[in-house]
Amino acid sequence: MRRAVCPGSFDPITNGHLDIISRASRLYDEVYVAVMINKAKKGLFEVEERIDLIRQVTAEYGNVRVESFHGLLVDFCKQRDIPAIVKGLRAVSDFDYELQMAQMNIGLSGVETLFVPTNPTYSFLSSSLVKEVATWGGDIAHLVPPVVLEALNERLRKD
């Protein structure tokens, strides 16, 4: 069985993330979405909320599993016999950082990293940008799945 992982914080998941996950799900038999736990960062959504949102928006693919992870991604991969990491690249600045990570990961464990160019529609998109625009009342309906838009609006009304 061909397996891959799409890692990230996904706070929240965007249409750009979803595009990469969707494309990976067509290339691999099983795709894990690994939601990073970073206790040093306070996210807008708790990890379990992010996992729930991702499960909802990836359910139609049928071969996507969503789990949290803490620590080294290569350890997550080793525990699940995952030989490949799939990463979307938006710009040259992404490539510089991701190449360093890919070289470290293959050196640590032999896990390969495959870079997927981002759909140009989403080349500017990040979770941080989505949160910033949403905080100030901007229209983000075209940037996130409807269930995420609803969750964001609800969360921002509370805060």
What are these model-predicted stretches?
Residues 1-159:
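Nucleotidyltransferase catalytic core that binds NTPs
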